[in-house]
Amino acid sequence: MLNIKWIRENQELFDDKLRQRFIEPMAKRIEELDGKKRKITNLIQEFQHARKVKSKILGNINPKSGEEFEGLQRDVKDINEKLEELEQDLNNNNELNELLNTLPNIPDEEVPYGIDESMNKLIRTHGEVDLNAQNKKQHFELGVKLDLMDFEQTAKISGARFVTLKGDLAKLERALANFMLDVHTGEFGFLEVSPPVLVRDNAMYNSGQLPKFADESFATTNGYRLIPTAEVSLVNMVADTIIPREKLPMRLVAYTPCFRSEAGSSGRDTRGMIRLHQFSKVELVSITTPEESKNEHEYMTNASETILQKLGLHYRTMLLCTGDMGFASQKTYDIEVWLPGQKQYREIASCSNCGDFQARRMKARYKEFGSHDTTLVHTLNASGLPIGRTMVAILENYQNEDGSITVPDVLVNYMGGLQKITAYKE
């Protein structure tokens, strides 16, 4: 959620930032609604003060004093009725909060203006693309031919956008998760967490998924939602807390299943493992101070890139433009891996600095030792990485002419010494 005080004091800049996000100016409407809310709040405070004064006088008067006592009683009763009416008006005046809840984060000054992904900015590349590679198969062709990846029978169980992995591909999935967790905990100092994957609506609201993206998640019949990313569970670990400054940055990593309805993705990536309803992902989250969040963003992006470097995969890092950024983010890097079977780059990681946007929603603060003042933390998240898309990249980049898959060197020990994935044999 955005800072209403900042909006009030920077109306022109606020509207300009909204235009960069392709949203109509809202400053005047917010000022009107905010003014109405503040007026009611001030009246409530005035009446509460009057009630306190009259109640104190009433307590010092003999009940047998007659008209003066009865008059004060009537005054207190009238004040209580007026307060009840004003508080009801305040509770019913939800338009301001509803409007603020639909507004995305303000883009950082370093974010380029742009309409869509075609206007994202290239930051760096790693490795080289073999443009002469011919007859490279896509991952689902390889997996099905090896009889280690099943879509047809799985569709009978769960429908479209699900997959079953078998044998050495199931083992590769487990190996990748262990490898990623080892790198992030051992080399980058993230604390491994095993969080819930069922959360309440308020947790989804805190992280920015609700109310705007309600139709993109799976809801249970008893008030829970399946997480679309472990970011939801991890950032909420500091909801409604005040963290000692010396405990920051708080770096967390989790490996969880993730669930997405893929609403609005009809017809896109209908084959293969690129866009599934259920997938596994290693997620990074950092809680830090406003002064350190930019450096932390680079640190986390480096952690994600390191996984791809160790796997020997070619990728490029893009700075997203204003029209392609996520709702809660003020600055995002996307890491795109090269897929020779598709002959294109595909997003494999997203690394975002959300500033105090999520912290304001979930009331997450920190304070310096010995101080009574508190400040909103900054929250950051990064894919570290999605297991399925990483497997896609390995299958397409490490495929051999006979259809087998060479296991990347860094994963051989995690695969029990296996160096090549071949067709399943019963």
UniProtKB/Swiss-Prot annotation:
Query: What positions does the entry give for ATP binding?
Result: R260, S261, E262, E347, I348, A349, S350
Give the EC number(s) listed in the UniProt record: 6.1.1.11
**What GO CC terms are in its UniProt record?**
cytoplasm
Could you give the domain comment from the record? Consists of two distinct domains, a catalytic core and a N-terminal extension that is involved in tRNA binding.
Named from the GO MF annotations, one term is: ATP binding
- Cite the entry's keywords alphabetically: Aminoacyl-tRNA synthetase, ATP-binding, Cytoplasm, Ligase, Nucleotide-binding, Protein biosynthesis
Q: In which pathway does it act?
A: Aminoacyl-tRNA biosynthesis; selenocysteinyl-tRNA(Sec) biosynthesis; L-seryl-tRNA(Sec) from L-serine and tRNA(Sec): step 1/1
Would you tell me the protein name for this molecule? Answer: Serine--tRNA ligase
As for what it does, the entry says:
Catalyzes the attachment of serine to tRNA(Ser). Is also able to aminoacylate tRNA(Sec) with serine, to form the misacylated tRNA L-seryl-tRNA(Sec), which will be further converted into selenocysteinyl-tRNA(Sec).
Q: Where do the annotations place L-serine binding?
A: T229, A230, E231, E283, S383
Quote the NCBIfam families the UniProt record gives. serS
GO BP: any one term: selenocysteine biosynthetic process
Please name the Pfam families in this protein's record.
Answer: Seryl_tRNA_N (PF02403), tRNA-synt_2b (PF00587)
- Extract the coiled-coil ranges from the record: none
